[in-house]
Amino acid sequence: MLPDKIIYEGKAKFIIETKDPLTVIQYFKDEVTAFNKEKYKIIEGKGTINNRISTFIMETLEKAGINTHFIKTLSEREQLVKKLKIIPLEIVVRNIAAGSFCKRFNIKEGEKLAFPIIEFFYKNDGLADPMVNENHVLYFGWLSYEEMEEIKTITIKINTVLIDLFLNAGIDLVDLKLEFGRPINDNTKITLADEISPDNCRLWDKNTHKKLDKDVFRLNLGNLKEAYLEVAKRLSVKLC
């Protein structure tokens, strides 16, 4: 049973208050959504799988020198994380053409990009998370120029680490969505937030290009839980 002190509910997680004002609990739900919540389902066990995968990836990134909000795993569904002031942007880095990128630029799905492309999206469900450029980011004060450059540098480093991590598991990292924030006691420290799991990465089998991410649900391609379990297995993530 969840405690009463839920301070935020997202599509896939609850954020829960703790006695420490500098930390919160991130609770992984079994809900899965697509198309701005137009498609919805509860898949038993999805939250526990994502918790374990994200824990493994956050620990890998910390070892690589990336500052993340992750502190420790508390249970099969819960993580203790730093409390952040979330920056209202989603940063997407693309390595292979897929999804909306193909529609916007009339590019065939699966085309390998010559270099990683970074895109910014304004986090606003009511506006359907519109794509924005760097001038928008500066104009609305979401980031300073220096912070924007820092986030781009961090994003490329994360992408590089994860490309290698997944490649060693026989998986191509097609694209990746990241969120960042600032600790409430240090407004200058850009910190990786949220989760990294098949919910917010596109992951394809390197040889067959079989989808192993939320597109399985989005596009009705089969059993989402089986796909996520396959990712965990290939990464040697322990689920119990």
Curated annotation (Swiss-Prot):
The keyword ATP-binding applies. Keywords: ATP-binding, Ligase, Nucleotide-binding, Purine biosynthesis. CDD domains: SAICAR_synt_PurC (cd01415). GO terms for molecular function: ATP binding; phosphoribosylaminoimidazolesuccinocarboxamide synthase activity. Its EC number is 6.3.2.6. GO terms for biological process: 'de novo' IMP biosynthetic process; cobalamin biosynthetic process. Pfam families: SAICAR_synt. It catalyses: 5-amino-1-(5-phospho-D-ribosyl)imidazole-4-carboxylate + L-aspartate + ATP = (2S)-2-[5-amino-1-(5-phospho-beta-D-ribosyl)imidazole-4-carboxamido]succinate + ADP + phosphate + 2 H(+). Gene3D superfamilies: ATP-grasp fold, B domain, Phosphorylase Kinase, domain 1. PANTHER family: MULTIFUNCTIONAL PROTEIN ADE2, SI:DKEY-6E2.2. This is Phosphoribosylaminoimidazole-succinocarboxamide synthase. The lineage of its organism: Bacteria, Pseudomonadati, Pseudomonadota, Alphaproteobacteria, Rickettsiales. The gene is purC.
